[in-house]
Design a protein with these regions (language model features):
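...with weaker cross-activation on analogous glycine-rich loops/strands in unrelated enzymes
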Residues: 5, 51-125
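Solvent-exposed, flexible loop/coil residues
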Residues: 23, 30, 66, 135, ...
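Active-site signature of cysteine proteases
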Residues: 111-151
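N-terminal capping segments
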Residues: 1-55, 148-150
Length: 151
C-alpha cells in the first residue's frame, strides 16, 4: 500500500474549485462532480495506485459512505487492526450513519491515528473542500481492509 499512501500524500492541499462548489478532479474522473467527494477521493487514490475498488454503486468505486459501509460489511472486510492504506469511515454523531471517509496512514503513539481525507478542513469534518492530513481519535469510526485480489 506504499504507492497508495504516496499518491494520497501528493494530493494534500488540493482544493475544490470554485470554493464551496464540491467540484474537483476526483468528481470529474468519477463522473459525478459537484457533490460531496470524500468517497470519490478514496476511490481515485486506489485506482491511481493500481488497486481499483470494486463497483460499489458506481463503476469506479464508491461515492456514498452508507452504501460503501454496507458493501464492505457484507464482504467481511471490517477490521479492528487497520494497516496503512486501509479505508476509514467516520460516524460523527454516533447514530449508525457514516458521514465521511478517508485513508488510514498510521497509529500515533498517543492512540490517535493519522489519515488522509478529501473534502475536509480544520473547521468542517466532512464538507471542508480540501485534501488534508488529519489526526483523529479512534472513536465512532470503522476500518476496512479491502481484501481484493488483483490478477
Amino acid at each position: 500500500m506504499d504507492r497508495l499512501i504516496e499518491i494520497a500524500y501528493k494530493e494534500i492541499g488540493t482544493l475544490e474549485s470554485p470554493l464551496n462548489s464540491n467540484k474537483t478532479k476526483y468528481g470529474k474522473w468519477f463522473g459525478f462532480d459537484g457533490v460531496a467527494w470524500c468517497g470519490m477521493f478514496v476511490s481515485w487514490c486506489y485506482a491511481f495506485a493500481g488497486k481499483p475498488l470494486p463497483n460499489i454503486g458506481f463503476k469506479k468505486g464508491f461515492a456514498g459512505c452508507q452504501t460503501a459501509v454496507a458493501y464492505f460489511k457484507k464482504k467481511g472486510w471490517i477490521t479492528t487492526k487497520p494497516v496503512s492504506g486501509d479505508i476509514i469511515f467516520f460516524d460523527w454523531n454516533n447514530d449508525g450513519r457514516y458521514d465521511h471517509t478517508g485513508i488510514f496512514v498510521c497509529w500515533n503513539i498517543n492512540g490517535t491515528f493519522t489519515s488522509i481525507e478529501g473534502n475536509t478542513s480544520l473547521t468542517n469534518q466532512s464538507n471542508g473542500g480540501q485534501v488534508m492530513k488529519r489526526v483523529r481519535q479512534n472513536k465512532n469510526c470503522i476500518f476496512v481492509h479491502p481484501n481484493i485480489v488483483y490478477v
